[in-house]
């Protein structure tokens, strides 16, 4: 590449009825979750933010048991880690049936005369006959991922396309070349490709094949807009002023649910950011607080060991808090924001479905006025009806798939959050317990 320096390496890092749609944070279990509980799977449930807190005030007042009736072991906080391992094992078993594996890793920084950007290695392993080789390894930058998503939207308008992480960041607030930002984006891009690779339709898209295998995408990017996309634009133009008369209730229900779901996640995102800000401020105070005891110990010969112990204890607590804050910033918030973007993308597809139905209704009404002149239904009306039915079938299947993925993602997210908090309080408890012998030891004055 002309005018560029050597790349700098960065650290690598079942089907469900649409009427049974449930908020991921709802306290009421679904039938599917009940079935999972009977088979021994552990289900983590969280009360809805809208409901008052009716939980028992103490552990003694609460019946601690697992969904399958097995009493919970409260004496071993580390049991949450075993639950996380069980969820990971379920993912490994699902992976045995897949035939396409995609991974995004190894980000590298490229400094050119005109711009500076990050590329990521995209590795593919597959047994599909559509691919010439069983393994591929190419490098892609963010705009390549954006090109892929746009092509999927053009060629697969009846399906939910997974979201990409937001492209623009506020300059001066977020350093888009920092290791933390690059790693967070890498995880999001990896999740984006994995969702496409697991989709029974999107994974066979020709543009996805090109993205995974082509060494250079420039020749493919120069191709003009597809005919299907132009047809979609004409539909929007023709039906922009038409109001639907017979919109299916199930799709109206999905739209209402997505609005509420997105609102709840937005609230969680804002509150979580405030919590992180307060934790960072508290962390800064702790870092100043601990050394004071260490300095003081130099003046108190008789209290030297206890004061040094308190200083070390505060230091250990600040380290544990830093780890908890980093986990919330790098693991918790990205999932919340991904599903906020996912909801917005899904609502866009639902609007396209309404536009196709509006086109069908408009043509059907026009054909009805001429029914006396014709004995058969016009071909274009039948084609529009087929489009609507295709849209409906694809959206129902994608909605079921999205609900299953969402339930699994939020289960892992909440389980991970619980596990990290347990680890934090365990470390703080251990730190404070370690200095009790020093405080109880009565030293004789010399």
Swiss-Prot record:
Membrane topology according to the record: Peripheral membrane protein
Annotated Gene Ontology cellular component terms: early endosome; early endosome membrane
Domain PX: 98-219
Function according to Swiss-Prot or TrEMBL: Involved in the regulation of endocytosis and in several stages of intracellular trafficking. Together with snx4, involved in autophagosome assembly.
BP GO annotations: positive regulation of autophagosome assembly; protein transport
InterPro entries from the UniProt entry: AH/BAR_dom_sf, BAR_dom, PX_dom, PX_dom_sf
Protein name: Sorting nexin-30
Keywords, ordered alphabetically: Endosome, Membrane, Protein transport, Transport
SUPFAM superfamilies linked to this entry: BAR/IMD domain-like, PX domain
Subcellular location: Early endosome membrane
A GO term for molecular function: phosphatidylinositol binding
SMART domains cross-referenced by the UniProt entry: PX
UniProt domain BAR: residue ranges: 243-446
Pfam assignment, any one: PX
Residue numbers spanned by region Disordered: 1-84
Biased composition (Polar residues): 1-18
Family stated for the protein in its record: Belongs to the sorting nexin family.
Biased composition (Low complexity): 70-84
């Amino acid at each position: 590449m002309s005018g560029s320096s050597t790349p700098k390496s960065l650290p690598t890092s079942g089907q469900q009825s649409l009427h049974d749609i449930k908020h991921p944070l709802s306290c009421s279990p679904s039938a599917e979750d009940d079935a999972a509980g009977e088979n021994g799977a552990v289900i983590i449930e969280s009360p809805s933010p809208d409901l008052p807190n009716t939980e028992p005030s103490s552990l003694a007042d609460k019946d601690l048991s697992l969904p399958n009736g097995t009493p919970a072991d409260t004496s071993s906080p580390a049991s949450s880690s075993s639950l996380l391992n069980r969820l990971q094992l379920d993912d490994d078993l699902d992976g045995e049936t897949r035939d396409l594996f995609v991974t995004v890793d190894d980000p590298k920084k490229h400094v050119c005369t005109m711009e500076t950007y990050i590329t990521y290695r995209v590795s593919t392993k597959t047994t599909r006959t559509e691919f010439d080789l069983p393994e591929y390894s190419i490098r892609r930058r963010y705009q390549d991922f954006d090109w892929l998503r746009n092509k999927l939207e053009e060629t697969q308008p009846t399906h939910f396309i997974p979201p990409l992480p937001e492209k623009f960041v506020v300059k001066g607030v977020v350093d888009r070349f920092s290791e933390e930002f690059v790693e967070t984006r890498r995880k999001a891009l990896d999740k984006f490709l994995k969702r496409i690779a697991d989709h029974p339709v999107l994974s066979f898209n020709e543009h996805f094949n090109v993205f995974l295998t082509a060494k250079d995408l420039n020749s493919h990017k120069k191709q003009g807009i597809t005919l299907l996309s132009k047809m979609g634009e004409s539909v929007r133009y023709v039906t922009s002023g038409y109001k639907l008369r017979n919109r299916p209730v199930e799709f109206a229900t999905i739209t209402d649910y997505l609005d509420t779901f997105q609102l709840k996640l937005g609230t969680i995102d804002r509150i979580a950011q405030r919590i992180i800000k307060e934790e960072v401020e508290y962390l800064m105070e702790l870092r100043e607080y601990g050394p004071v005891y260490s300095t003081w110990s130099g003046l108190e010969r008789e209290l030297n060991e206890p004061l040094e112990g308190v200083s070390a204890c505060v230091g250990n607590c600040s380290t544990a808090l830093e780890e908890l804050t980093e986990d919330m910033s790098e693991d918790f918030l990205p999932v919340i924001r991904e599903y906020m973007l996912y909801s917005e993308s899904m609502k866009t597809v639902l609007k396209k479905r309404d536009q196709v139905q509006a086109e069908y209704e408009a043509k059907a009404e026009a054909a009805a006025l001429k029914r006396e002149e014709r004995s058969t239904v016009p071909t274009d009306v039948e084609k529009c009806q087929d489009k609507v039915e295709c849209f409906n079938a694809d959206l129902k299947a994608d909605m079921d798939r999205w609900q299953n993925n969402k339930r699994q993602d939020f289960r892992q997210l909440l389980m991970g959050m619980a596990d990290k908090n347990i680890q934090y309080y365990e470390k703080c408890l251990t730190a404070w317990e370690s200095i009790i012998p020093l405080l109880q030891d009565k030293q004789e004055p010399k």
